[in-house]
């Protein structure tokens, strides 16, 4: 076993980002600064949900990763599959305990979200579009969790809508990117069933819907700090048009959408803190 494999399988950079998004969701909803204890708990509950889900996903994706990502910890033999499963369950348990110290709604929400991350890797991921929507919903749940942690939703609801739409687009692009490995293993992802071109059209539609949804907060008086959302919209439009022109651009497109998502969260935060300005 490799010690570094236990860190790598968590994908800590993604989990740290998710934890930060959870905190930002709390800040956006609170329209101010909650106490540090609450923000710390939100960060770690989101972190362990993300890391547990990533670990479980690698457990279930072992055969696919041997083709698509042979350098991942399990395919290269950094740890056994059984160890990965127990490790995922341990992370879920730690996150659930921490969630209990926030409030009962935060505990219930986290428990449901954790179960969905496990169910996704176990059963939902191979289902065309269903798997994509599940991942997008879990991503959108991150800022909402932060909002629940501070006891209010506020602008975090609009952030969740945008996060859901853009991540459906991104997940479809990722399926287009992985189409060869998925075909080799007999997977039935959306691009395999309806073709790369039609899948690209659906991905682009969700991208354009995100741009439209990004204007919703303006109606409720979000602050001037929200202005950088224009840059986000430009990035999303570019990624959507590129994949429409050539589905092979999906790899670059999904990375652009990941960047756009983070910039959007910052824009929502700045808008919430400058509300009324």
Curated annotation (Swiss-Prot):
InterPro entries: DGGGP_synth (IPR023547), Prenyltransferase_related (IPR050475), UbiA_prenyltransferase (IPR000537), UbiA_sf (IPR044878). Its cofactor is Mg(2+). Keywords: Cell membrane, Lipid biosynthesis, Lipid metabolism, Magnesium, Membrane, Phospholipid biosynthesis, Phospholipid metabolism, Transferase, Transmembrane, Transmembrane helix. Pathway: Membrane lipid metabolism; glycerophospholipid metabolism. Its EC number is 2.5.1.42. It is an enzyme of class 2 (transferase). It is found in: Cell membrane. It catalyses: sn-3-O-(geranylgeranyl)glycerol 1-phosphate + (2E,6E,10E)-geranylgeranyl diphosphate = 2,3-bis-O-(geranylgeranyl)-sn-glycerol 1-phosphate + diphosphate. This is Digeranylgeranylglyceryl phosphate synthase.
